[in-house]
């Protein structure tokens, strides 16, 4: 065989061997990455369990400020140390609750937003959205609180108890924000969309009070 004829076949062989080597390396890296991820996930879940236990103790009767700070630091470590943790959103939500209880409203809001960004779903998602509203309301930012409560109501259905709570929160902040007409509309909406509401008498009382106010 002439040299010119042999070169193409040798190149094909080398390319094939190189490709096989690359595939083997990629497979090894992928396997190693999977094991690393599983290891990180396991450690993260253990850390979250420990932090959640501290959080539960910090929210119990007779809990001290020091206990709450320990729980906050533990949850902060989980959120920052395990950014890919499957339950990272749950950790951020718990962190938001503790920060809110400590009066750290901007920090609590940030934690709730992280929980939403990490894809928490169902009840926790709605609670995180409501939590954002609570932080704005605590700062007397009623327009922003109303927007957060309305977003929370949109994230659930009328048969969910959190839908009712979100609309009640919305109406309250509308009243506090000097928008009685909007609050009245929200209360009426709640009576229409949740006719069997357990808070019917309370809502009717608010409706009567708002309707009795002199028009401005």
Predicted regions and their residues:
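Short solvent-exposed coil/turn linkers within tandem alpha-helical repeat scaffolds
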Residues: 79-88, 102, 116-125, 153-162, ...
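N-terminal positive-inside, membrane-proximal cytosolic segments immediately preceding the first
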Residues: 1-25
